[in-house]
Each structure stands twice: as structure tokens, then as C-alpha cells.
Amino acid sequence: MKAVISTVSQASVDVRDDSGEVRRVGEVSGPALLALIGSGRDDDADAWETMVRKIAELRLFPASGEPWGGQRDLSVEEVGGSVLVVSQFTLMGKTKRGRRPSWSEAMPGPAAEPVIEKIVHGLRNRGIHVETGEFGADMQVSSVNEGPYTVLVEC
């Protein structure tokens, strides 16, 4: 399992429905995180729990009054922030050979969707406000990164 996690002042995700209408399905504002999460075919059964802990507890925010370029002392949980979770199987793409990514290491959609749902519920159970994209949909994700401060988390 991999996640690209960015501190954001705002982030949103829109989905185009069957009629062609674009609708907003999730939106957060700072302090907040945008978490793009991909599940791997060989992920451990408890990888989602580790991911919940990492997203909730990683110290990605500066202490109150500290500049954004300074040391990071607080987690999204500690600052009372929000998380926008977007499923992103393309994070599992392999690009070592050729010009077309291979998705062979990505967890198939029917198995990956409940894993992403477990992460969302796990974060909410910790008292974190969570918004989501729409699993399997063609989404438009927008964000205003703070810093920018982005980390890759692998579980």
C-alpha cells in the first residue's frame, strides 16, 4: 500500500456523472491533508491499519506560530484538521521497463474498495473529519499545497 500525502490549505474532488454533469463529492480546507492511496495486490491484511495510523499521526504541520518552512511538530489529528482521501490505483504502477506503466501490482477494484473504506472509517473513528472521492470514478482533484510539503508513505 502506498499513499502520497500533501499538506493543503484546500482540496476538492469532482466527478462527472453519466449525464455529463460535474458534481463536487468531497472538499476540505486547512489545516488539511490530501491523501492519494493505492492498494497493492500483495498488501498485508493489516496494512490499512498502519496507513490509518500514519495518516493520523505523522507530524506534517508546524506548531502554532511557526513558519511553514520550520520543523513539523503536529499531526492532522493534533491540529483538528481534515483529510481528503482519494483512491489512486495508479500509485502501484511500475515504470521500470518500457513506456507504458504496468498495473500488475495493483489490487483489483473489487478487493481494493473495501480497503479504502476501512481507511476512511479508521480515520473517522479517530475523530478526524474525512471527505472522499468516488471509488472507480473519473475524478478531477484540485488542491492548494502548503509548503509544498508532500510525503510518500508505504505500508
UniProtKB/Swiss-Prot annotation:
Catalytic reaction(s) noted: glycyl-tRNA(Ala) + H2O = tRNA(Ala) + glycine + H(+); a D-aminoacyl-tRNA + H2O = a tRNA + a D-alpha-amino acid + H(+)
Pfam families the UniProt entry points to: Tyr_Deacylase
SUPFAM superfamilies: DTD-like
Principal subcellular localisation of the protein: cytoplasm
Record's GO cellular component terms: cytoplasm
Subcellular location, record wording: Cytoplasm
Keyword Amino-acid biosynthesis (UniProt): no
Keywords of this entry: Cytoplasm, Hydrolase, RNA-binding, tRNA-binding
InterPro entries, per the entry: Daa-tRNA_deacyls_DTD (IPR003732), DTD-like_sf (IPR023509)
Molecular-function GO term, any one: Ser(Gly)-tRNA(Ala) hydrolase activity
Biological process terms in GO annotation: D-amino acid catabolic process
Enzyme Commission number(s): 3.1.1.96
Keyword Hydrolase: yes
Signal peptide feature range: none
Motif segment (Gly-cisPro motif, important for rejection of L-amino acids): 147-148
Function noted in UniProt: An aminoacyl-tRNA editing enzyme that deacylates mischarged D-aminoacyl-tRNAs. Also deacylates mischarged glycyl-tRNA(Ala), protecting cells against glycine mischarging by AlaRS. Acts via tRNA-based rather than protein-based catalysis; rejects L-amino acids rather than detecting D-amino acids in the active site. By recycling D-aminoacyl-tRNA to D-amino acids and free tRNA molecules, this enzyme counteracts the toxicity associated with the formation of D-aminoacyl-tRNA entities in vivo and helps enforce protein L-homochirality.
Oligomer status and interactors: Homodimer.
Family: Belongs to the DTD family.
Domain note: A Gly-cisPro motif from one monomer fits into the active site of the other monomer to allow specific chiral rejection of L-amino acids.
Name of the molecule in the record: D-aminoacyl-tRNA deacylase
